[in-house]
């Protein structure tokens, strides 16, 4: 998917009332050789709030910044959170391309359903993503093996400790210029078939992209790395 021209995007975003606050101070951009994976972040982020009875509201693009959460927020205690991951690339013709981003937002909603999180408007999410990338376009690296990693995610923000679905959430999108996920680049990786520590069982949350699934994989991954494997 090509990123649409900025005038068209701005018109559509304006009709959806996404507020835009541009960063007054731009960050220095890292060299392509130092990128690694997920260490650096662009100048802006997208935020959308949810309140029970009001729905999703106040979509906005703002300068990248820390967020403030109550220590009792449900995301910390019960892991009610979902996320996605996709990339944007620059072609030799200087076009910005996305690969089936609508499928990522569709999958995000499937994860939402499993974690009792309200469904997001996939068209709004896609338009917000396009606008965010347009604003931070200069952050997309063009060296071989590099790209702009896109991380959409939702967190439960209610600040009480009963085990129940939250009534408030935040949906955010952040961007990170990246190199290869593995130190060896695009070369083959050594994979261990883990038989003791698992992240998915029948009836569980394995089909959802939720933080707890990845936390449960860390032990097996740690042991595999110690034995010289790259992944489990």
Question: Model features per residue range: what roles?
Answer:
Residues 1-15:
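Short, Lys/Arg-enriched N-terminal segments with co-localized hydrophobic residues
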Residues 9-10, 55, 138:
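Residues in intrinsically disordered, low-complexity segments of regulatory proteins
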Residues 15-128, 132, 161-232:
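Helix-start/capping segments and mature chain N-termini
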Residues 121-123, 139-147, 232:
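Flexible, glycine/charged-enriched surface loops at secondary-structure junctions
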Residues 135-136, 143-148, 152-165:
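Non-catalytic, conformational "gating/processing" segments within enzyme and secreted inhibitor domains
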């Amino acid at each position: 998917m090509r990123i649409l021209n900025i005038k068209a995007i701005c018109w559509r975003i304006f009709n959806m009332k996404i507020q835009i606050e541009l960063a007054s101070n731009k960050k220095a951009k890292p060299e392509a050789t130092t990128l690694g994976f997920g260490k650096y972040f662009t100048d802006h982020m997208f935020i959308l709030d949810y309140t029970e009875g009001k729905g999703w509201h106040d979509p906005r693009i703002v300068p990248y910044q820390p967020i403030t959460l109550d220590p009792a927020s449900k995301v910390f205690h019960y892991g009610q959170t979902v996320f996605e991951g996709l990339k944007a690339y620059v072609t030799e013709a200087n076009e910005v391309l996305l690969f089936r981003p609508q499928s990522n937002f569709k999958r995000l909603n499937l994860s939402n359903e499993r974690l009792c999180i309200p469904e997001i408007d996939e068209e709004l999410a896609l338009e917000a993503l396009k606008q965010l990338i347009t604003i931070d376009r200069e952050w997309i690296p063009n060296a071989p093996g590099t790209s702009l990693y896109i991380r959409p995610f939702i967190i439960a923000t209610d600040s009480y400790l009963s085990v129940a679905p939250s009534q408030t959430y935040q949906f955010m999108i952040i961007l990170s210029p990246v190199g290869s996920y593995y130190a060896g680049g695009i070369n083959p990786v050594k994979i261990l078939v883990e038989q003791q520590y698992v992240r998915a069982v029948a009836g569980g949350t394995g089909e959802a992209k939720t933080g707890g699934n990845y936390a449960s994989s860390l032990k097996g991954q740690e042991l595999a790395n110690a034995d010289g494997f790259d992944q489990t």
